[in-house]
Design a protein with these regions (language model features):
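Catalytic cores and adjacent flexible loops of soluble metabolic enzymes
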Residues: 1-187
Length: 187
């Protein structure tokens, strides 16, 4: 799959195991590296690193996984918060720790199910995150990604200003607002 998809234009491989079992990620990482494309090793976030009673899913746990992925040769480390569990202050603390542990870029992926998405991204930006995933405003929130429109505005005029034209985003927002209505029954 990796070779064929690479031959047909896939440029970035986000490789993860839902249980963060590094042994299960070795072969796909090795194969993706052979393609010469970007290999992003992802760590699935769960638990609550701010909870003093949390014994397994700690900052040390995530840092160890990140070091293992970097050692495998991953070009980027993704923190994949598929359940919107990562709280804003936890994001700041964890991204700071990951930036200290590895030398490759850190990519944060979250969903906005809890409504914390933008706050989480702002704290991650303060901590130095390199990449985040967003959705255009009219397609964002709920189980989608946080709003790109909101993030661009929140960061405007700061050291993390995206440089993205908000007026251009409004054009896209209006287009997709119409499209979203088609899929409303499936939300």
């Amino acid at each position: 799959f990796i070779k064929v998809s690479s031959d047909h234009g896939v440029d970035i491989y986000r490789i993860f195991d839902s249980m963060n079992w590094m042994e299960n990620m070795k072969l796909p990482v090795e194969e993706a590296l052979k393609t010469g494309k970007i290999v992003e090793g992802a760590i699935c976030y769960t638990g609550d690193i701010l909870n003093p009673k949390e014994l397994k899913y700690t900052i040390d746990y995530y840092c160890k996984k990140a070091r293992q992925l970097e050692k495998m040769g991953c070009h980027v480390i993704a923190l994949k918060d598929m359940s919107s569990l990562l709280k804003p202050y936890a994001a700041k603390k964890l991204i700071e720790a990951l930036k200290e542990e590895v030398r490759v870029p850190i990519h944060l992926h979250t969903h906005d199910t809890t409504g914390n998405g933008i706050a989480t991204y702002l704290m991650a930006a303060e901590a130095g995150v390199d990449i985040v995933d967003c959705a255009i405003g009219s397609m964002s929130s709920l189980t989608s990604q946080p709003s790109m429109n909101a993030l661009v505005e929140a960061l405007r005029g700061t050291k993390r200003d995206t440089g993205i034209d908000p007026d251009g985003l409004l054009v896209l927002n209006d287009y997709y607002e119409h499209e979203r209505k088609i899929y409303k029954p499936f939300e």
